[in-house]
Amino acid sequence: MQDFSASPREMVASFVRNRRLISALIKREVLGRYRGSFIGILWSFLNPIFMLAVYTFVFSIVFKARWGTGSDSKTEFALVLFAGLIMFNLFAECVGRAPAAILANVNYVKKVVFPLEILPWVNMGAALFHMLVSVGVWLAAYSIFFGVPSATLLLLPLVILPLILFIMGVSWALASLGVYFRDVSQFIGIVITVLMFMSPIFYPVTALPEEYRGMLEFNPLTPAIEMAREVMFWRQLPDLLVLLQYYLGSMVIALLGFAWFQKTRKGFADVL
């Protein structure tokens, strides 16, 4: 039985070696998701617009929520919330689909020689496309209400990259576990819902009592959400020490997830 390398070098080499295949599969995934609908891929633009409008109405008008900055601006709360939600949605879309990544492509396991490790990258690429659209909607709304965004917005890719590494590590692990344990998909759905409310998306960290703030510090999404808001809305530079720690931690998770996937993939065909 073939042995699959689990080295850090192979994790990078596999992506580079299969980049054209990954790109083609991402395109197929994005277009296929909207195939048959009346307005097609335009839904990818309309969805974040509707989402931003709904959150603005519900939280700023119905609940009259404010972010704790002393400002009464309804659009400020909506844009701060939406910036955090953009980061969370990247995580939720990839991780939510990860347990079925192999199960949905059984033919790749049984009938052809296929680099299965790229399937989580396909989910990531499709999610990044939707994220890019959402950032565009956020940017348009910010420009209308607050003017030209700060140059710190250019640092957003540096904030997103460690989140991508973290998500990929989790996705590789879940893609493998989903083959052997079919209940993983159901469990992950619950975890994602819990994380949504346990992340500083709908409220600032300072809104929690001191004794509960520690819970958010153990949430791996908190640094990404907070730093994204800093560079997107608050016109601040991210804390370099926090960013470096996030990079290192995310790299460890990515390497462990990839190693687990490579070590367990030999049994996929037997289970499927």
Describe these PLM feature segments.
Residues 1-272:
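Hydrophobic transmembrane alpha-helices and immediately adjacent juxtamembrane helices
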